[in-house]
Amino acid sequence: MTRLVLCPGSRSGPLAAAAGLLAARGDLALTTAIDERSAAFLALGMATAGGRAVAVVTTSGTAVANLLPAAVEADRSTQPLLLLTADRPARLKNCGANQTVNQEQFLQPVCRWLGHGAPEGLASQPPQALFDLAHEAWRHCHGRPPGPVQLNLPFEEPLHGAPEDQLSLQVSGLQRSAPAPSSDSPLGAAPQLDPNQAGVVVAGPWRGLAPALPAYQQALLQWLARSGWPLLADPLAAIPADCPGQLDGWELQLDRLQLAPGSPVLRLGPLPASRRLEAWLQRQTGPQLLISEGEPRGLDPLGLADQWSGGLAAWWAEQNQDFPGASTPEQLMPQSGIASLLRQRLPLQGAVNEPALAHWLPLLLPPQLPVMLAASSPVRDWLIWGGLQAQNRRCFSFRGASGIDGTLSLAMGLAMEQGPMVLVTGDLALLHDSNGWLHGAQGNPPLLVLLIDNQGGGIFQQLPIQSKQFDRLFAMPQRVNPLALAAAHGIDGRQVACLEDLPEALEWGLAQGRPALLRLATDREADARLRTQLRSAAQNAEPLL
């Protein structure tokens, strides 16, 4: 473990002192945070970018309960997260002692493993027992599948001895080792697909550990080159740039994608955020194979696919390489004029609107710059309107549980770990996690936040909801000045008045090299109408071929 996020508290004092000393020695990158909920999301962002667990330290009581939202997301997005929660010793439990609750039960349903220190306090445990506890926690964090682990650690007083005394166990002598092999039951043989048979690949959000991504991408390239199958890719699929077989604007023209009866579908990871794709998959008559990156739990709410959890790289390695050379199958859907249509209908001029932002941002941002999309309208808009440029960019979104809580903190964590980053978010998601701005004071993470301010929950405007109290019951607009709120945290920001100003505003924001905010005000009612109009035009568009 090389990163730790520390939250304030007295009962966690021994852990804080030890972390501080390790950081002073250069053995640990230490970040502090006053809000446990935000801190856990920050750590999850770091862990996702780095592909290894980041620890969060909290005191006892309600502090532990605040870890639950991030733990739920880590569980469902299969990312490692180590939660170190200080606790009272057993003698203070169930007797009315202050700040003493049943915190060992708060996170258990979503954790891969719950480890306990000695009930009478950690000081009573021999060093080897603590080493074994730490090793077991790390193993479960990175098991099959990865996920959150809680170590509930009782501490007896005195809590605040000299820092050197807290390290009397010589933690620095604990060897860093790779996670122990998982004890899960072995996988069955990888299902075989015939690359000479016409089929299609549907690539959903990538859910693996970062170090495994290159092998996944290479396997995808090899299968596509071997089979010639077209690729329906989510921007979150982390496909390699210029991946062959990509279909531009596929979500808008699924009705034109006609498979021969019995044609197979290779699905990678969970479903993209498209109800139209779900309906299309339900119309197919051929076998559907779903490959997950180590996730044994079901990822097919449609109940149509056979799932194999060994990962795409392992699946490709087990495919029959003796098939005769395949010619590229007949094109299943002619490349349409969607890109030209959207360029005409969404010019880079006039009032800011959400489809235009989703179309132009992938074109205007530097190609290698990663983007995080809030798990609401942005992730859906980029799928629909972003085109090939969105598919070929490394995009993140935390859709394990698809909550909007923790959006800013997650993006800060990504930027701290991997460098320059852009967050595209709505106003409610940003406001919900406004404490995330506090992380900008530590190390100046290079994060540019693009705030689509549509005065409330714009995603609900796209649903068939008819209510005279729509704003009050669903959109819930808030009377907050986001630029002023950011400025109160020392964050510079600008208002983007029109689409013509967007390129210069992006250039300014990216040049800051630290957290910055661009506010883009939109009209959610007008944008909902525009989306409907664009879909209708896409259905009537003539194909290029």
From Swiss-Prot:
Domain of life: Bacteria
GO molecular function, a single term: manganese ion binding
InterPro entries (UniProt xref): MenaQ_synth_MenD, THDP-binding, Thiamin_PyroP_enz_TPP-bd_dom, TPP_enzyme_TPP-bd
EC numbers for this chain: 2.2.1.9
Record flagged with keyword Nucleus: no
Cofactors, names only: Mg(2+); Mn(2+); thiamine diphosphate
Pathway participation: Quinol/quinone metabolism; 1,4-dihydroxy-2-naphthoate biosynthesis; 1,4-dihydroxy-2-naphthoate from chorismate: step 2/7; Cofactor biosynthesis; phylloquinone biosynthesis
UniProt cofactor note: Binds 1 thiamine pyrophosphate per subunit.
Pfam families, per database record: TPP_enzyme_C, TPP_enzyme_N
Disulphide linkage map: none
Catalytic activity: isochorismate + 2-oxoglutarate + H(+) = 5-enolpyruvoyl-6-hydroxy-2-succinyl-cyclohex-3-ene-1-carboxylate + CO2
EC primary class: transferase
Region feature (Disordered): 170-193
Function: Catalyzes the thiamine diphosphate-dependent decarboxylation of 2-oxoglutarate and the subsequent addition of the resulting succinic semialdehyde-thiamine pyrophosphate anion to isochorismate to yield 2-succinyl-5-enolpyruvyl-6-hydroxy-3-cyclohexene-1-carboxylate (SEPHCHC).
Subunit structure: Homodimer.
Name this protein carries in UniProt: 2-succinyl-5-enolpyruvyl-6-hydroxy-3-cyclohexene-1-carboxylate synthase
Protein species of origin: Parasynechococcus marenigrum (strain WH8102)
